[in-house]
Amino acid sequence: MRSRDSRVSTGLACLLVAVVLCPSAVRAEDATAKIDIFTFVPARLTVKAGTTVTWRNEDDIPHTVTSVTQRFKSRALDTDDTFSFTFTEPGTYDYFCSLHPRMTATVVVEPDNAAK
């Protein structure tokens, strides 16, 4: 029994070392934004490449999350609906609500230097 426990402990230790030494194998952190009172919060979100951003509509009426360049576009999100998009390329992504075009915000994607 001790031999089996020893193998399990060794395996877990190896896994931990692999995760620590190979940060590119670890997924980029996810980020969240909300839609409330005709506003995207935060208005400017900075993330690393590989990050998935999830927007949640906390307003009482539908909204969309639409990239100015049409790179991403949600359907109309009712209250508590979500939309997610993974940003793989560094850059600045301006977006708006297609139902209320004065609602605007930006996602800034920085290079994920840990992945190199």
Which residues are covered by each model-predicted region?
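Extracytoplasmic copper-binding redox domains, predominantly the cupredoxin/blue-copper superfamily
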Residues: 2-9, 15-16, 23-116
